[in-house]
A protein has these predicted regions:
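Transmembrane helix-loop-helix hairpins at lipid-water interfaces of multipass membrane proteins
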Residues: 42-102, 182-187, 285, 289, ...
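Loop segments that connect adjacent transmembrane helices in multi-pass transporters
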Residues: 123, 138-143, 216-264, 354
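ABC-type nucleotide-binding domain
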Residues: 359-653
């Protein structure tokens, strides 16, 4: 027997290419069962065998019970043999006791293995999805991925218990009960089961219906989860727009679609045992006509008839379960096909077999963009972008929203790859570098500070090795210490889902402290001070400028006051570099930068470049001091996928 630790499945060979949406091509039942057994169930072989033995014992007891009906009627109730009362009673008690113990044992074992398999399957699924490209998370919203991870994995892991129950308990029950029935009268048995062949065609039709409707029901459930995710995360926007009734109506429409799909699926599953009951009724009708006359004629005893009647009545119970498991398997098969489709996804961005050595010091980490082009869904974002961010200096990127600034960051870190051109760091193309080592070159601070539902300390450290002295230095540099000391538990205070227990400015400071602590040779700042007030911005800006010293730094800024001291400013417009130089040089030449600068500071007002007319979002939960609360594992999964998607959400900027 194996340990209780969920087993990680062996490496699989998925099909190349990333699909734009998760598709679920039909797989053969044998292939799916083989996959489930090979990667998960076989790790619990000892417990599976024990469960099979207990199920077989439980099933055999039904045959024993029906067999005891004959002496109970003939010897005790009809003949009145007092000496037979005790042993018949003891035998019946023994049968019920053994059946109860076997049932208890196999149910506990099946539940245990089911939970372990479900945990292992979900763990493997999450690990695999985190290896996929950003496009996968853009094309598949969190609600869909949560439904796959929780709903489909649970259905796939639990179906094994139903299948094994039929394979062991119900098959043994069926055989033992049929043996008793045949021993009483084989002709009665033939009459009782004569209608069984009539079930073949309708059951096949219903099985296909169940598989289709189960797939539709799961897809509808995924749409409901996605809608809920959008509603809860966009509650402030909905309230400010006054669209509560509209969003509630859209959610109700999705719910209606899901309910309709689930009703069709349940109706298909319920139809199989219903048909079996009708055929069973016809069989009993024939046996009563034929066997009843034999009892009247005295050729059969009441005990024989009751034993046969009990056996055949019990036979149809495992047969009904067989019908149910057929429907349950078709539903689970749809889930397994969807899971298999995700496992078949393969990242297009991978580490080369022989990665090049990395430039690990700041004086070698110059970054060169050479004729870089990129597009989203055939919509060009970058068009032949070429410039150099010199080693050890600060390069700022400015331009209207949609100019492609944030896309450059995504390409640098290989969250996506350019469709043309190349990016080099220290003269080495990023596509030839080890992915983990490449991303390890960067400290990143974006305008969307992504925090996890952990302590403040954990959100700053984020897996980095740091002693208390280094941690304190980072906290002081980002001015996190100022508010951390006021929290109930200091650095050990949970920040809430997505950092909802902190204000927007506080979340931004935590992200900056995280970057300070990482202490990497390349610093990427994507509107890093956008969430701060003027006083905090000045303090943090000074800390960032100090952090930038001696590093290759790239800064995306809307407020041009924050990049006046940059060594070089690259001006972008519609995916192209239209100008570059220092602040003074660009102002002297005129052009787009000078226009943006005058726009921001005309009449003493600050207007973000390209931000005029941008919709104003409502206050974040953290700004009001409200604490968001998760809801167990489902909330944790939702937060994880939300945070992963947040990494890619601004890529088109």
């Amino acid at each position: 027997m194996t340990s209780d630790t969920p087993q990680k499945s062996p490496a699989r060979e998925p099909k190349p290419g990333v699909r734009s949406q998760i598709s679920a091509p039909e797989k053969g039942s044998r292939d799916l069962i083989r996959w489930l057994w090979r990667d998960y169930l076989r790790h619990h072989l000892g417990f599976v065998i024990l469960a099979l033995i207990l199920m077989s014992l439980e099933g055999a007891m039904l045959g024993a019970l029906s067999y005891l009906i004959k002496p109970m009627f003939d010897k005790v109730l009809v003949a009145g043999q007092s000496d037979a009362v005790l042993w018949v009673a003891l035998a019946v008690f023994g049968v019920f006791s053994l059946r109860a113990l076997a049932s208890f044992g196999q149910r506990v074992i099946m539940a245990r293995v089911g939970q372990l398999v479900s945990a292992a399957l979900q763990g493997d699924l999450v690990r695999h999805m985190l290896t996929l490209d950003g496009r996968f998370f853009q094309d598949n919203p969190p609600g869909t991925l949560i439904e796959r991870t929780r709903g489909d994995s649970g259905a796939a892991a639990n179906v094994w218990a139903t299948v094994l129950s039929v394979a062991a308990r119900d098959v043994i029950s069926l055989l033992s009960l049929l043996a008793v029935a045949i021993s009483v009268d084989w002709r009665w048995t033939l009459i009782a089961v004569a209608g069984a062949p009539l079930l073949a065609l309708p059951i096949t039709v219903l099985q296909n219906l169940v598989r289709r409707t189960s797939r539709s029901a799961r897809e509808a459930s995924a749409r409901v989860s996605t809608r809920l995710d959008e509603i809860f995360h966009g509650a402030t926007t909905i309230k400010l727009a006054g669209t509560e009734r509209r969003e509630a109506g859209r959610f109700q429409d999705e719910m209606s679609g899901m309910v309709h799909a689930q009703i069709k699926s349940v109706a298909g599953q319920a139809g199989i045992p219903a048909l079996m009951d009708i055929v069973a009724g016809l069989g009993f009708f024939g046996v009563l006509l034929y066997g009843g006359q034999q009892i009247i004629d005295g050729t059969k005893t009441v005990g024989e008839f009751m034993s046969f009647f009990t056996a055949m009545a019990l036979v149809f119970e495992p047969l009904r379960r067989l019908g149910n498991v057929s429907g349950a398997w078709q539903a689970a098969r749809a889930s397994l096909e969807r899971l298999h489709a995700i496992f078949d996804e393969r990242p297009s961005i991978t580490t080369p077999k022989k990665p090049a050595a990395l430039p690990v010091t700041a004086d070698r980490a110059d970054i060169r963009f050479e004729n870089v082009a990129f597009a989203y869904a055939d919509a060009p974002v970058l068009r032949g972008t070429t410039f150099t961010a010199e080693a050890g200096k600060t390069t700022a990127l400015v331009g209207a929203s949609g100019a492609g600034k944030s896309t450059l960051f995504h390409l640098m870190t290989r969250l996506a790859d350019p469709v043309n051109g190349q990016i080099t760091i220290g003269g080495v193309p990023t596509t030839k570098m080890d992915l983990v080592q490449l991303r390890g070159l960067y400290s990143v601070v974006s305008q969307d500070a992504l925090l996890f539902d952990e302590s403040l300390r954990d959100n700053v450290v984020m897996g980095a090795e740091a002693d208390e002295a280094k941690l304190k230095k980072a906290l002081d540099a980002a001015h996190v210490s100022e508010f951390a000391l006021k929290l109930d538990h200091g650095l050990d205070t949970p920040v809430g889902p997505r950092g909802s227990g902190l204000s927007g400015g506080q979340r931004q400071r935590v992200a900056i402290a995280r970057a300070v602590l990482r202490d990497r040779p390349v610093l990427l700042l994507d509107e890093a001070t956008s969430a701060l007030d003027a006083q905090s911005e000045k303090i943090v800006q000074e800390a960032l400028e100090k952090l930038s010293e001696g590093r290759t730094s790239l800064v995306i800024a809307h407020r041009l006051s924050t990049i006046r001291n940059a060594d070089k400013i690259v001006v972008m417009d519609k995916g192209r570099v239209v100008d570059e130089g220092t602040h003074d040089e660009l102002l002297a030449r005129g052009g787009l930068y000078a226009d943006l600068y005058r726009l921001q500071y005309s009449e003493g007002k600050t207007v973000s470049d390209g931000s005029a007319g941008r919709a104003v979002s409502g206050p974040r939960q953290g700004d009001t001091g409200e604490d968001g609360k998760g809801s167990g594992l489902l909330a944790a999964t939702s937060r994880m996928f939300g945070n992963v998607m947040g990494l890619f959400g601004r890529a088109k900027d």
